[in-house]
Each structure stands twice: as C-alpha cells, then as structure tokens.
Amino acid sequence: MEEFQGYLELDRSRQHDFLYPLIFREYIYGLAHGHGLNRSGFLLLDNVDYDNKYSFLIVKRLIARMYQQNHFHICENDSALNQFIGHNKNLYSQMISEGFADIVEISLFIQLVSYLDGKATSKSLNLRSIHSIFPFLEDECSHLNYASDILIPHPTHLEILVEVLRYSVKDASFLHFLRFLLYEYWSWKSLSIKKKASSIVSKKNERFFVFLYNSHVCEYESILLFLRNQSSHLRSTSFGILLERIFFYKKIGGLVAIFGTPFEHIHILRFLKDPLIHYVRYQGKSILISKDRPLLMNKWKYYLVKLWQCHFYVWSQPGRIHINQLSQHSLHLLGYLLSVGTNPLVVRSQVFDNSFLIDNAMNKLETRIPLFSLIGSLTKAQFCNPLGQPISKSTWADSSDSDIIDRFVRMCRNLSHYYSGSSKKQSLYRLKYILRLSCVKTLARKHKSTVRAFLKKLGSELLEEFIKEEEQVLSLLFPRALSASRRLSTGRIWYFDILCINDLANHE
C-alpha cells in the first residue's frame, strides 16, 4: 500500500513541480532499494555489503542529516560514520543517488503515460524489444544506400547535465541538490583514481549516471528531430516546449558558420529535407541511413559536429562520424553485421512469338553473425581456443552432470534465441557445435574418460537434451505444426521479448 501511496504523492508533486520534498520520504529509498535488488545485481555488483547494511535506521539517520540544511554533513567520513556503516564510506551517497534516480524516473514516466493517454498511441509494446529494430530495417534499408555511423560524445561539464534536466524538472531546489551530488561524485572519482580504488561513479551508481546520460542524449535527439521536421513544424504547437528553451536560437546560431545565412531564415533548413532518412540509436552510438547521395550525409555530418560544439560545448571531431555505402561496408548493430546485398532475379517476358529476359536485381538486408568476435568471447570464457577448437570448461568439472548439461543447453538456447534472425545460419551452427563439443569434453574430463568413449556411452541422450530445448522454443512459436516450424527454423525469426543483450555465461 505504501508503494501506491508513493506513486500518488509523486503524481501530486509533479503537478506542482515540487520534487525536492520527496527526498525526505522513507518509502522512496525503499522503492529504490527494491528496484536495485530486482535488477539482478546490475547496480550493486561490487558492493555486496550494501544489501546487508541497508535498513530503515540508516534511512532515518540519512534524512536527519539532510534536515540539517548542510549537505556536506551527509557524506563526511568521520570515525563514527565509518563505525556505523563499516568500510563502505559512501553508502549514504549511494542511497541518495538511487532515490534521486527513482524520483525523476517515476516522475518522467508519469508524464509519458499522461502524454500517451492523450495521444492514444501506446499500442506497440513490442518496441521495447531489441529485435524490434531489425524488422523495421528489413523494410526500410533495402532501398537505402548510405549510412552514417555516429559515436555520440559524452558531456565534458557537469553543468550541462543539470541544464538538460531543467526542461523537464522545474523544482529549483531539486536541481541545486542534483548539482551538489554531481560535483561531489566528481571529486570522489578523482580521489578514488589517486588511491587506485574502485570508482564510485563507474559501478556503484551506474543507474544514476546512465539516467543522466540518457537525458543528455534525449536533449540532443529532440533538437535533431526539431530541425529535421522542417519549417512547417517550427511553429507547430507540438514543439512548444522546444521553442521555450533558454538561448536555443542563440546556441544554434552556430549553424551560420556552415551555411553563411542567418538562422532566422528557416528556409535554409530545406537542404536537409530527405523523406527517406532514418535514425537509430543504440548504446553510445547512432546511425543515420539515407537514400540520397553522400553530399547530404556530409552536410548532416558537419551539422552534428557543430551542434555538439555550439549547444553542448562538447568538442567532437568529424572522424567520429563514418559515412559508408551499405552495399560495400557492414554496420555493427546490436551484435549483428548489417549490409545490403543484391538478390539477382531474372524474369522472362513473352509477347506472342517474342520472348525477353529481364534482369531485375532486388536489394535485400543481410544480417550476419560476427563470428570471429563471438569466437573471441568463447575463447575468453574458456570454451575454445583462439582457432575455434572446443576445449573443456575446467571450472565446471566439479558440478553435477545435469548441472553441466543444463548450463550448456541454456547457452545454446540464448545463442539460438538472439541470433535466430541471421540470414546465414552456418555461423550459428558453428558456435553451437563449439558449445556442444565443449560440453562433451567437460563431462569426459570429469569422468576421466576419452571423448569417443563418453559419446558411445551417453552420446544419444546428450544430443536429445540440446534438440529438445530447440524444439521446445520453436513449438511455442508454431504450436500447431512442429514440422513446419522445423522448416521455418532455417529462415529469419525475430523475438519481441528480448530486452537486453545477455553475456554468454550470464547463467553461471
């Protein structure tokens, strides 16, 4: 019940733009702690004591310190604090950052839900899946020619992150507290590097800084969308929030250096008009795909560099943006190699006694598996050598036979699940062969037997385990016709339930 009460209070605080008082609510830190535990150790991977030390007694002491109106008393490393929370001196700061991230995330989510309710566009929930981008690219990229592979620069000044949140968070006290946290983390990071200790910024508060980085990227993308939609949308009411931005036209005036005409003349943006241009962002990279000639892509390239330098004060070199022709180069996207290949098609046309052969080449998006990089990952995980030859997993030899088989089966299932959309299955078959033979060698090593002798004893039963797992996945997709599902297994299958890229050995 307290959780629902917290969400209702967040909604009321958002309506009045007062988020700072929520930092003094105990249930906020309970929500943040629960979210951290539900993320499978994503946040607290190197801080096991955080779960053991967490209690509402610590939360009460934290809130009491914040009521002193002196933020520097919160994180001071006096002896009493160290005795109370052990060797982890930054527990208070970690709790504050997680509570802060929870407040802002939930507040922005409520804004998004209310916006979608008004627009009635919240239908495609499968867009949360990583695989949802590939069917879109199959439909759109087959007739596009050029792609820009863009490495998004990180903000170099902490004040930029605060300025970005000013457009969505109106509470000045909340933003001042955020500024304090950021500068404290910056000093702690420098101190931890000097002492050769683990950085608090890199892992312990990863969710907090990932949220700030995503806010920075969304600001960059909103300006990109703002200019992409041409002069007909510049005065649209849907972009009213963008027009209210402080110094927007002043900062974006750096475009004059490229175009040589004042920015007030909106018609200068018409040269960027391209109805067949698509934008995709993943992790710290983004891709612009277009049908036009390289001239337009080069204009976008130098525009983006100027945008980063003038609006975000980030120095970025043009070398961070690579323009390639899709028919000649491959793009690395979410574990796949993407390229556009030509599929030759000969059509025979006959009119009375005359017949003609017409060559009609069609473009097709090729999705290939980066075999060598995955073999490198398997080598690092000690499943094979650098040449791709399977070896035994010695660290698993002490486990039971069923546990060893189950681990390898899950790894094969993860590979089949994620790379089911590959246009060429040979690479996937080779990876699964490496894992299967590594499983056999691991079991043979455990029983002090040879691979040949072990296969004669348990070969058919072991093979059934792998085949049963794959048929089980396909039968969920095509329950009425398993034979048809086996034929379709050679084609592309995209799953809409994949929310993240798991490591090969994530189920250890």
From Swiss-Prot:
Localization, UniProt: Plastid, Chloroplast
GO cellular component entries: chloroplast
Keywords of the record: Chloroplast, mRNA processing, Plastid, RNA-binding, tRNA processing
Phosphoprotein listed as a keyword: no
Main location: plastid
Matching InterPro entries: Domain_X, Maturase_MatK, Maturase_MatK_N
Biological process terms in GO annotation: mRNA processing; RNA splicing; tRNA processing
GO molecular function list: RNA binding
Pfam families: Intron_maturas2, MatK_N
PANTHER family: MATURASE K (PTHR34811:SF1)
UniProt function note: Usually encoded in the trnK tRNA gene intron. Probably assists in splicing its own and other chloroplast group II introns.
UniProt record similarity statement: Belongs to the intron maturase 2 family. MatK subfamily.
Protein name from the UniProt record: Maturase K
Upper lineage: Eukaryota, Viridiplantae, Streptophyta, Embryophyta, Tracheophyta
